Amino acid sequence: MEFHGWSFGSAEAVSGEVVFNTSMVGYPEQLTDPTYSGQILCLTYPLIGNYGVPSEELMAENLSLKLESEKIQPKGLVIFDYCEDYSNWEAEKSLEQWMKEQNLTGIYGIDTRELTKILRDKGSMSGEIIPEGAAKPEAPAKPSPADVCCKEVIVYKAETAQDVENINGSKAATTNGKKVVVVDLGVKHSIIRGLLARGAEVVRVPYDYDFTEMEYDGVYVSNGPGCTCNCEKTVEVLKKVLEGGKPVFGFGMGYHLIAKAAGCELVRLAHPHRSANQPVRKEGTNRTYISSQNVYRAVKAASIPSEWEVYFTNLNDGAVDGIRHKTKPFIGLNFAPEVCVGLTENVTPLDEFISKL
């Protein structure tokens, strides 16, 4: 199957798993999300590029102030129409300029709705973007957390009220004296900023690092690219952590690894959740939330141990989008814990995690 369009950005041919996202806004954040590492990302919103790209400014320890990582993560971008003219008070460059600087190959003029229907019905598949005159690309390597995680332990602190205001855009307590270990499978920088803005000290460790001898108050297990089969050492570490009682929180792949450590089985979703409008119901209540997800697996309901319970259920397909321990502060979710823009009158899952430290 072939789609023909016009190239923009890098002129290099690329290959990778083709995935989609149906969000209306947020392409700078999506393009820097480590979960998309090595993939070809198809955006369904019909016009991309009209508000440019914000500052790539980095804070201490290479923490991005605006984006989700230090660089673009996918190998390719597929869109319907590209807007060369951009306007936004935070914009510093055009999308195409950024793509050329970071060697991201793009194609526009594609019926992204039709492509997304194919991906939705048949599941993710490999694809190629080949600009005219370019050689056929090599077969893609399978993405892994090892490609995007930190290589050593990194400590982040928000030491002053001004630090917190710079991170969060609003004033908050400078510190709560709590230390959170972030297991980096490809952590989004907004998560680290969100933890700092809530007064925590963040210790970021590689995904296969045994941190159990460290002093900490809670553990956050991040999302990331690839398959949980690459993370057996992480599962073994989490098994030791779950023997204790300190708060543990994870989303995406982090949720899946917590579930495996607890003894759950994972199932591949017939239709991957790759959008910002996934409805989830909080069990035991009549409350429904609209969640942002980028996952292709969920926990098998029948495999959940007796000491755990379903926390959130997806209302589209009935998938288990969250579990929690009945007596200990352990939570895993398939969706982002909303640390940037959201319903400010609601307590987010990240707030709930911080409150239990």
Show the residue positions of the predicted features.
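RNA-binding accessory domains that recognize and position tRNA/RNA substrates
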Residues: 1-208, 228, 340-342, 348, ...
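Proline-centered loop/turn at the N-terminus of a beta-strand
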Residues: 105, 179, 247-249, 265, ...
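Active-site glycine-centered loops adjacent to acidic/histidine catalytic or metal-binding residues
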Residues: 111, 252, 295, 336
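Active-site-proximal beta-strand elements of phosphoester/diester hydrolases
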Residues: 179-184, 291-292, 331-335
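Phosphate-binding active sites in nucleotide-utilizing proteins
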Residues: 179-243, 247-250, 257
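Cysteine-nucleophile active-site neighborhood
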Residues: 222-292, 298-301, 342-352
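Catalytic beta-strand/loop cores that center a nucleophilic Ser/Cys/Thr
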Residues: 287-328
